[in-house]
């Protein structure tokens, strides 16, 4: 609520900046500010929206990148001081700031930048004593990573990391919660091929609004390198009370092209 401090921070970051609700998520509670003249009013509006939506008016400022990619790092850590990364994922394909397609590893990332950020994420887990599965999210532009946040939970897109490393993230999460050490070391985590996940949503394709109702026929795809995570079945009624995602289709291949082709066929 300190106007002068907010202006100073924004000037130091450099316009454009983005005002974000600290308690926000799913693409809500964000406002881009291109000029200094609009900063204070944008902060006030975002605070009001955040208070109404999340019960918390706290906001913060970040540098707004014009053409970034969304790249994140999957980590696992236990109570014995061990931590590993399961490489990275690209989640750039979104609508309304919500992910719809994810892949691992993230294509076209500078190798040196990747190595540095993977090591930094593992070091951060050890330094803070983190336990469980987690994801460090970044924006990536022009060979540089910009930290967004850490999600201290399992994410929807975790299967692509499982497919390219062979590590069962859910099993490890439950095991370390019970006090056991990780069953893998960093040397055990070997990148194998490429994986892609498509989120299947019960939505109107024109408006992207949720479309609850009866699923008359459901025939999931199968075959080599194809995985389906879902709870639905023929005759299932999609309720109107929850998120519209009803399934995840994941494909794995020796190369990105093979994973894409298998997804296209699926």
Task: Enumerate the language-model features and the residues they cover.
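A conserved helix-loop-beta module that forms one wall/lid of the active-site cleft
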Residues: 1-22, 29
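ATP-dependent carboxylate activation and anion-phosphoryl transfer catalytic cores
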Residues: 21, 26, 33-266
């Amino acid at each position: 609520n300190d106007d002068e401090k907010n202006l100073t921070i924004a000037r130091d970051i450099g316009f454009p900046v983005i005002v974000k609700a600290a308690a926000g998520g799913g693409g809500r509670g964000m406002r881009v500010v291109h000029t200094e003249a609009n900063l204070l009013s944008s902060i006030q509006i975002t605070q009001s929206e955040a208070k109404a939506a999340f019960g918390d008016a706290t906001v913060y400022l970040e540098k707004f990148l014009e053409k970034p990619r969304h790249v994140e790092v999957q980590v696992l850590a236990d109570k014995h001081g061990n931590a590993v990364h399961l490489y990275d994922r690209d989640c750039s394909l979104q609508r309304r700031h919500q992910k719809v397609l994810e892949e691992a590893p993230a294509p076209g990332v500078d190798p040196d930048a990747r190595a540095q950020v993977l090591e930094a994420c593992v070091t951060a887990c050890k330094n803070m004593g983190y336990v469980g599965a987690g994801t460090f999210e970044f924006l990536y532009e022009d060979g540089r990573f910009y930290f967004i946040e850490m999600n201290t939970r399992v994410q929807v897109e975790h299967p692509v990391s499982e497919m390219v490393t062979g590590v069962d993230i859910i099993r490890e999460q439950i095991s370390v919660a019970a006090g056991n050490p990780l069953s893998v070391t960093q040397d055990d985590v070997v990148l194998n091929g490429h994986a892609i996940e498509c989120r299947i949503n019960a939505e109107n394709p024109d408006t992207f609004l949720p479309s609850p109702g009866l699923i008359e026929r459901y025939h999931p795809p199968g075959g080599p390198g194809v995985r389906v995570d879902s709870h639905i079945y023929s005759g299932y009624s999609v309720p109107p009370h929850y998120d519209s995602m009803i399934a995840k289709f994941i494909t794995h291949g020796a190369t990105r092209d093979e994973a894409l082709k298998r997804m296209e066929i699926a």
